[in-house]
A protein has these predicted regions:
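Catalytic cores of RNA-modifying enzymes
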Residues: 1-226, 255, 266, 275-278, ...
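C-terminal lobe and adjacent flexible extensions of AdoMet/dcAdoMet transferase-like proteins
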Residues: 225-287
Length: 287
């Protein structure tokens, strides 16, 4: 069965009485080059254990099982369980987990299914869970890389440079844990039903060690969250949402870090955020 052929897909779904759910962000791939190129970009091979989230009917899954030592796919929509059992019936290195990926313990899944294998994430992620899923993946520190098809706008945010409109707290988070690269875009015509936006594939090798030294990651994310809380305001004003320090002291801390007093949060690089975090932590400790 060609899992990217529009007519075969429609026949398969009709046979199982399936209707697309907008609430679940379901858009199935109908161009074979897309799942093939995603699987290639992931670097999956016989020594790889792949976690896939949101397999749909399995076009990317089919590419991954051909390359990988083991594929574990997590699907929330119970209507797709019998569909996947049919489309993946011949794959002896495939396991379906029925449930919500956001409720899974990723390190435990890897221990149970990927012993001796290099764990990676490779998925055509539903748009509505992209940010929380990627956040959960990087914070779990258990994947070697993430290769995902997501909304192009989100991909550009993840790969953005400091000082651009796309740069934000999520950018800093992803670039702290990974080295993201936008590989290629995927037009709406490659999906059924066609979404209203263009998609993109990003590959994110996970860093072995943090790129900067901070007093604690909790304090770093506190600083980043505060810095972007009031995007139209200066960094000093924004920091007041997260730190109970006098404005004058915050200004002194910002300038001591080599930043202009009137700088805005989106101008700070990851290195700037690390220096600022450590200075703020020291100021609080001295109170």
């Amino acid at each position: 069965m060609d899992l990217c052929d529009r007519w075969e897909i429609q026949a398969l779904l009709e046979r199982h009485g399936f209707r697309f759910s907008k609430a679940m962000g379901q858009n199935f791939l109908i161009e074979g080059w897309v799942p093939r190129d995603i699987a290639d970009a992931s670097g999956a091979d016989e020594q790889t254990g792949v976690l896939e989230i949101g397999p749909g009917i399995g076009p990317l899954t089919a590419q991954l099982v051909r390359r990988s030592g083991k594929v574990v796919s997590v699907e929330l929509d119970e209507r797709l369980y019998p569909v996947l059992r049919e489309t993946m019936a011949d794959a002896d290195n495939f396991t379906l987990i029925e449930g919500d990926a956001m409720k899974l313990d990723f390190p435990q899944v890897i221990r149970e299914h990927f012993a001796g294998l290099r764990p990676i994430l490779c998925a055509n992620l539903p748009y509505n869970i992209t940010t929380p899923v990627l956040t959960k993946c990087v914070e779990s520190r258990c994947f070697d890389s993430l290769t995902v098809l997501i909304q192009k706008e989100v991909a550009e945010r993840i790969c953005a440079q400091a000082g651009t409109a796309e740069y934000g707290a999520f950018t800093v988070l992803m670039q702290y844990y990974t080295v993201p690269e936008l590989l290629f875009t995927v037009p709406p015509t490659c999906f059924l039903p066609a979404p209203k936006v263009t998609s993109a594939v990003i590959h994110c090798p996970v860093r072995k060690t943090p790129p900067v030294n901070v007093v604690s990651e909790t304090t770093l994310w506190r600083t980043v969250k505060a810095a972007f809380a009031l995007r139209r305001k200066t960094l000093v004003n924004s920091l007041q949402t997260g730190y109970q320090l006098p404005k004058e002291q915050l200004t002194e801390i910002v300038t001591a870090c080599g930043l202009p007093a009137a700088v805005r949060g989106e101008r700070l690089t990851l290195r700037d955020f690390a220096a600022l975090t450590n200075a703020l932590a020291a100021a609080e400790q001295a109170k």
